């Protein structure tokens, strides 16, 4: 067998080259079969055995990817160097016809002398001076520590931070929004350091469908004041599917299929067309960054849906933490 880093040489001159080393993975995600009500509708490869074979094949040709089997035969733990590397693998699999469910990226901790250590990234940022305040504020809230600041005198500033790798999950899109697309962000792996403390993965809740059906414009119009919606009229939904971002920190169950009641009464000004706000398409990267620990992304060749890990509202109620 030949492995990455091996040297092929003559028998009488066995002089191996310096072996190549690959950085240890810092992020892990759970890949599993889809158990949603729409399972098998859009994907042609849904079996756990096929998903396992595909992941093993990926580890053989991509040395930065590792795969471990879990206590469940339908769930696989995939490790890599970052959430974008994971997103590339998932996107490749969906284009090959796979249908699967993935969880939120989780950092891989190490323990030394009983102390928990976490991966730390060195973060380089180049942005306009006008955005320095909001960038610094948000990175500080994510346990980032400023290491250096250089003002070029040209209206742009360079910032350097050391920050936990988990804090960068979902931050890149937010950074581009805060800097109006003009900011530049780069990172490199610095090493492991002491755990810097907890912080919320997201400051908003989810709007969760309480039934299966098709979304109706009337229902979505009435739900718009509650937050940003991810679906349009006519899109299929099911119980436990996340179809919007709640303005507040808590989750709410809602009915996106509710139709307007018809009656013989006709009132002036009640028949206007319903006008909905534009829906921002849910990309794979955005979905992976958006979900929380109790949520998952359902990936098919045609759709990307957000859902709760426990679809039943009663099941989620029973599992909620008790005070």
Where are each of the predicted segments found?
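Accessory interaction regions appended to the cores of large information-processing enzymes
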Residues: 1-323
